[in-house]
Amino acid sequence: MNDPMLRLSDIHKSYNAGQAGEIRVLDGADFTVDRGEIVALVAPSGAGKSTLLHIAGLLDTADSGTVEIAGQPLQRASDAERTRTRRRSVGFVYQFHHLLPEFSARENIVLPQLANGMPNAQAVARADALLDKVDLAKRAGHRTAEMSGGEQQRVA
């Protein structure tokens, strides 16, 4: 059996809510995603889904517990290491995808790769391959503002 791509174990997270005191959002949460697995995280509003995903995506830190991406423990990683791992290994598709509407689908995919140090030709080739994979190769040069919501999600 392969190591999971993502493993969160015994995750605890609380927020200080001022006069209301401390609010415990996660209390011993466990979450595992195997490589290639598609997972839906479904729970009532306020249950801690976004907090759990922000911890999994290294956008937030747990008060305690273990966070591993591709077998690498990251709960004590430096900000720089968390940023490197997030850039290379983590992707989110938000309900609101935050694409740059004046840029093409290809440009929206190329820009973050350039920011991560990938050479332009390689970033363009990778963007084109990804667009082909999600059946948007013919729309690569179209501005995302001209695309449907579903097409925008696939670009994101």
Residue ranges and their predicted role:
Residues 3-156:
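ABC family nucleotide-binding domain
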